[in-house]
From Swiss-Prot:
Main location: cytoplasm
Compartment(s) of residence: Cytoplasm
Protein name: Triosephosphate isomerase
Gene: tpiA
Reactions catalysed, as given in the entry: D-glyceraldehyde 3-phosphate = dihydroxyacetone phosphate
Organism: Thermodesulfovibrio yellowstonii (strain ATCC 51303 / DSM 11347 / YP87)
SUPFAM superfamilies for the chain: Triosephosphate isomerase (TIM)
Length: 246
């Protein structure tokens, strides 16, 4: 059984100084914690500094994004090869904020997943429906489309983690109900089984969307929830430590 995976997505927060101050407080109070894997995804500008600290811990260095080419005239982009060189192990691909603000579609996301896996990186592939999708009973249809298109010709389930993040629950304080999470995670698991057969069990499915120290226990008790992707609550070392220690 894979370890539970708890990932901090800092988004566009923390200077290098603030990131290092977080680690100074967070690492000692979570040291020696067994039975779970912890990941932290800082901004690109903090990756090298954070990575130098994490190298002496079991915490995994994650990135929030990557481009689908390893080099070239792509102003402002960062390649999988560059991230790997900095010690990154996991890359978040397909986050709803990337889809919304940077117009990333399933084709771009699929190319990014291919590029990261080819470089030996593991991928945290984000999927999720909007509030309008759920109101129109299209949740499963949307999830199926995102999974099938995003994982097209991806034959390495051992390199994949899926993060189910209903868009309407991200940063809103609104958490999907236990039944909604259970149904969606079961659907995702079954989709993965259709694609990968028994190898689908190698893929962890995380929940993301207003995860807090107050709701982490109930979320982790839901079937097929094998971790969480944490946004706002991961910015505070004490709050994130409480989530990790649930």
């Amino acid at each position: 059984m894979p370890k539970k995976f708890i990932v901090a997505n800092w988004k566009m927060h923390k200077t290098v100084r603030e990131a290092l101050a977080f680690l100074d407080e967070f690492i000692p109070i979570t040291k020696g914690l067994n039975g779970r894997e912890i990941g932290i995804a800082p901004t690109f500008i903090c990756i090298e500094s954070v990575g130098k600290v994490l190298i002496n811990t079991s915490i995994k260095l994650c990135a929030q994004n990557a481009f689908y080419e390893n080099k070239g005239a792509y102003t402002g982009e960062v390649s999988p090869a560059m991230l790997k060189d900095c010690g990154v192990e996991y890359v978040i691909i397909g986050h709803s904020e990337r889809r919304k603000y940077f117009y990333e579609n399933d084709d771009i996301i699929n190319k990014k997943i291919h590029a990261c896996i080819k470089e030996g990186l593991k991928v945290i592939f984000c999927i999720g429906e909007t509030f309008e999708d759920r109101q129109n009973n299209k949740t499963m249809e949307i999830l199926k489309t995102q999974i099938r298109n995003g994982l097209l010709e991806i034959n390495s389930p051992e390199a994949l983690t899926i993060a189910y993040e209903p868009v309407w629950a991200i940063g809103t304080g609104v958490v999907a109900t236990e039944e909604q999470i259970k149904q969606s995670h079961l659907f995702i698991r079954n989709q993965l089984k259709e694609i990968y057969g028994e190898r689908a069990n190698e893929v962890r499915i995380l929940y993301g969307g207003s995860v807090t120290p107050e709701n982490i226990k109930s979320i982790m008790a839901i079937d097929n929830v094998e971790g969480v992707l944490v946004g706002g609550a991961s910015l505070d070392p004490l709050k994130f430590a409480k989530i990790v220690k649930y």
